[in-house]
């Protein structure tokens, strides 16, 4: 038995999310089907970050165990033959048996894309948040600084969170503008349920002028309520990178 790790890219627009559910299509169920077809085994996969319905990934990390021995290119090409066009295995690598895609991770990075224009985008409607009011990225950047470091992010989680601890450590949070696009780049040790989307929604409230910069600090201190924060839609959210200790070397 060997353990393999995959780098997986997907457009989550048409899926219920990562986790498999009855009677609906998920990223996990599609991957397990494709891997099982190639290996002629019943394959169970584990991911580094469970994405919600409509959320995308540029590099989701997935591991599984198998008895089949074949080349990395054979795995990649074989599995992709059984996957829909909006899911793709980018690379396959052997990994130490101690590795776990979720529990070995030391940080996750997400990017959120906002199309900030009075005229919405038809082509990218399921891949960005089309927002018509002008966003002041300088105000958003100042507000974002309050969120850096280790804090109790209870107010930024949605109902349904199963995490025992609500403390998280945000290492990096940047807000930049590229033409009509506003990008929010965030990395932390882990995230609570819908935490990124709730942070984005709150920063947008500051950027459009509905709330002052210091409102983010008020939110952070308000452990019990939401203070009318909004949740950004799933369409603009991308899982970009998951980091692991250096002794887990992947052959990409």
Curated annotation (Swiss-Prot):
Superkingdom, taxonomy of origin: Bacteria
GO MF, one annotated term: RNA binding
Annotated protein name in UniProt: tRNA pseudouridine synthase A
CDD domains: PseudoU_synth_EcTruA (cd02570)
InterPro entries reported in the protein's UniProt record: PsdUridine_synth_cat_dom_sf, PsdUridine_synth_TruA, PsdUridine_synth_TruA_a/b_dom, PsdUridine_synth_TruA_C, TruA/RsuA/RluB/E/F_N
Keywords for this protein: Isomerase, tRNA processing
Function (record text): Formation of pseudouridine at positions 38, 39 and 40 in the anticodon stem and loop of transfer RNAs.
This protein's encoding gene: truA
Family membership: Belongs to the tRNA pseudouridine synthase TruA family.
Keyword tRNA processing: yes
Disulphide bonds in the chain: none
UniProt subunit comment: Homodimer.
Catalytic activity, as annotated: uridine(38/39/40) in tRNA = pseudouridine(38/39/40) in tRNA
A Pfam cross-reference name: PseudoU_synth_1
Active site annotation, chain numbering: 52 (nucleophile)
Stretch forming the signal peptide: none
Keyword Lyase attributed: no
GO BP terms: tRNA pseudouridine synthesis
EC number: 5.4.99.12
Upper classification of the organism: Bacteria, Pseudomonadati, Pseudomonadota, Gammaproteobacteria, Enterobacterales
Enzyme class, first EC level, given as a word: isomerase
HAMAP family: TruA
Residue numbers binding substrate: 110
